[in-house]
Amino acid sequence: MKPEILKLIRSKLDLTQKQASEIIEVSDKTWQQWESGKTEMHPAYYSFLQEKLKDKINFEELSAQKTLQKKIFDKYNQNQITKNAEELAEITHIEERKDAYSSDFKFIDLFSGIGGIRQSFEVNGGKCVFSSEIDPFAKFTYYTNFGVVPFGDITKVEATTIPQHDILCAGFPCQPFSHIGKREGFEHPTQGTMFHEIVRIIETKKTPVLFLENVPGLINHDDGNTLKVIIETLEDMGYKVHHTVLDASHFGIPQKRKRFYLVAFLNQNIHFEFPKPPMISKDIGEVLESDVTGYSISEHLQKSYLFKKDDGKPSLIDKNTTGAVKTLVSTYHKIQRLTGTFVKDGETGIRLLTTNECKAIMGFPKDFVIPVSRTQMYRQMGNSVVVPVVTKIAEQISLALKTVNQQSPQENFELELV
């Protein structure tokens, strides 16, 4: 049996490799070897699997659908990517850049995480020509979905080696800056921060457009000094800066998630407006799955931790729950009383959100693959952008660039085509 079929079965039922292996009473290591192609699943085991899952999966349709599924990149596994990240980054980026000429614009993806920003800009006609991410598990998810292994520590990447691009995208960490200011003889106040790495690149590449994402706390971070330094730095470099805060729940996502967004253009004549939230609401109950197994919270943990009388209580939801849930955080798997949202379902009556439910409240497509452990999945989803919001911003950026080119063909904003 081909590995792709086994992956498809797990994806449809939202099972881990261990859960899938338990269905036919083999070790998770055996299942892992089947999926990786190291060994082949015996037909008898596949027949046993069909018998066990006949009420949940139409295997004839499954075989027919296989060719219609999104491509899953699996030439390299997690271990190979962890050990040989930079070498594989070089190899996969060379392949990626071959068809960059056919795109509307080219962009780079810094602090890329699992690729939420990339997903958003690609659907608007962009082509990614460089990506960077330090976390090995996020790299694996990124590779599985896009076929590219991101480069590692951006501080070790020479700016001159980064390809020319039209848009720099970055969901950078929020860090305080020096209060010394730009006095002669002193370092720039951004020195030693990840924003400084962005500055270093755009100084070298003269990047025409920037898209930056951060937590809304950036606005008041360090008594407003952080945002002040960012804007002053970009304006001193000739950029026209726009920024705002948008809430995902206003874009048809059942999650209250506010984020800070900044868009900047070197061309001062470009007119840009952030997307007006369509104010489309979606109830969390609409995306919840039924009869879920494997995500339950033990009764002991419920009694001894979740519902202690002297402490706060978690938010419990079900299919009848309206409105949006609290912000999904990267530490969701730690089952936090005050910030956690849990579902009234499962073997013990209360469970965690499933992989598919997390994808839904972050706006990822259903076929986006999460090849890592559940703990890593929660971390990755909690650290990601909400795809539909960024997609709308990317659409506005693309529209602004096209409009200025049409209006001023002689003195237009030339996109790099190298």
From Swiss-Prot:
Q: What is its EC number?
A: 2.1.1.37
Q: What InterPro entries does this protein's entry cite?
A: C5-MTase (IPR050750), C5_DNA_meth_AS (IPR018117), C5_MeTfrase (IPR001525), C5_meth_CS (IPR031303), Cro/C1-type_HTH (IPR001387), Lambda_DNA-bd_dom_sf (IPR010982), SAM-dependent_MTases_sf (IPR029063)
Alphabetically, the GO molecular function entries are: DNA (cytosine-5-)-methyltransferase activity; DNA binding
Keywords assigned by UniProt, alphabetized: DNA-binding, Methyltransferase, Restriction system, S-adenosyl-L-methionine, Transferase
Spell out the reaction equation it catalyses. Answer: a 2'-deoxycytidine in DNA + S-adenosyl-L-methionine = a 5-methyl-2'-deoxycytidine in DNA + S-adenosyl-L-homocysteine + H(+)
Q: What class of enzyme is it?
A: transferase
- The residue stretches assigned to a coiled coil in this entry are none
Q: Is this entry keyworded Ribonucleoprotein? A: no
CDD domains, from UniProt?
Answer: Cyt_C5_DNA_methylase, HTH_XRE
State the family it belongs to: Belongs to the class I-like SAM-binding methyltransferase superfamily. C5-methyltransferase family.
Q: What is this protein called?
A: Type II methyltransferase M.MspI
Lineage of this protein's species? Bacteria, Pseudomonadati, Pseudomonadota, Gammaproteobacteria, Moraxellales
Gene name for this UniProt entry: mspIM
